[in-house]
Regions:
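C-terminal regulatory/interaction regions
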Residues: 242-270
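Conserved beta-strand hairpin/beta-sheet module of binuclear metal-dependent hydrolase folds
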Residues: 17-71, 167-186
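N-terminal non-globular leader segments, chiefly Sec-dependent signal peptides
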Residues: 1-9
């Protein structure tokens, strides 16, 4: 809607700062971190092929590919690419990683639509942060699962940051549960009566409830600083094989996000 003011887009320098390379490492059996210093990408490995969640910036795609190979895997063995939300920091590298891997891209309908537009016509940011467009192969619905090689990944729709925002619940081969949580932030969004996203407030409130209700063993989020990535990696290096097992981390993340949202919503009340 042309009459709806947009939010200021973060500078590209911020995303580049988040995209510093780090070496891949194993989070737990069958789960590798292959992303950058603050933009998460995780590789779920099985004998039947692999699943990659999120693709960082376009310029990070070669680094993610190199990380997968350094971990001892082949990008061409990735069967599915999953996306949390369709902005340049989570979907920017998707076009290249899809082309290189031959994998099927799986996404919610709104994320698929926005990835096809290369991030343009963003409800909050307009055309400010484009990325290479990419076509989704499979539209996934809320609570729908895909299974591969003994693991099951279920889509949990958690809209608010974007209308298509999706968190992913993973049941690993050993029965442990991992959550890959999408952003719950509404940075500088105009929350009340947003003509481009009328359901924004009710959507994000519903997403707080959805994620707070999940009982998980391992909590991962799509930004490293949301789940203590670097601190937990250090614990892992110090010999703590359970460093990423964090059964309360998701609820703490939701509550922090909810409090920030309440403050923002209160400030915008007429």
């Amino acid at each position: 809607d042309p009459s709806q003011p947009l939010s200021p887009a973060p500078p590209l320098s911020l995303f580049k700062a988040w995209a510093k390379p780090i070496k891949p490492f194993q989070i737990t059996e069958g789960v590798w971190y292959v992303g950058t210093e603050n933009l998460s990408s995780i590789l779920l490995t099985t004998p039947a092929g692999h699943i990659l969640i999120d693709a960082g910036l376009d310029e990070s795609a070669p680094q993610i590919k190199a990380n997968i190979e350094a971990a001892g895997f082949r990008l061409t063995d990735v069967r599915y690419l999953l996306n949390s939300h369709a902005r340049l920091d989570q979907a920017g590298g998707m076009a290249r990683l899809k082309a290189w891997s031959g994998a099927q891209l799986v996404a919610s309908q709104p994320n698929a639509d926005q990835m096809a537009r290369g991030g343009r016509e963003d409800f909050a940011l307009g055309d400010a942060l484009p990325f290479p467009p990419v076509t989704t192969d499979k539209i996934i619905h809320n609570q729908e699962s895909i299974s591969l090689g003994g693991i099951t990944v279920t889509a949990l729709f958690t809209p608010g940051h974007l209308p298509g925002s999706t968190s992913w619940r993973v049941t690993l081969r050993n029965g442990k549960t991992l959550i890959y949580a999408d952003s719950l932030a509404t940075p500088d969004y105009l929350l009340i009566n947003n003509k481009n996203y009328p359901d924004l407030v009710t959507d994000i409130q519903g997403s707080f409830k959805t994620l707070a209700a999940q009982h998980v063993d391992i909590f991962i989020a799509n930004k490293g600083d949301r789940f203590g990535l670097l601190e937990k990696r250090q614990q892992l290096r110090n010999g703590d094989t359970q460093a990423f097992f964090d059964s309360n981390g998701l609820q703490q993340y939701v509550e922090r996000s909810r409090q920030r949202f309440i403050t923002q919503l209160t400030a915008q009340q007429p």
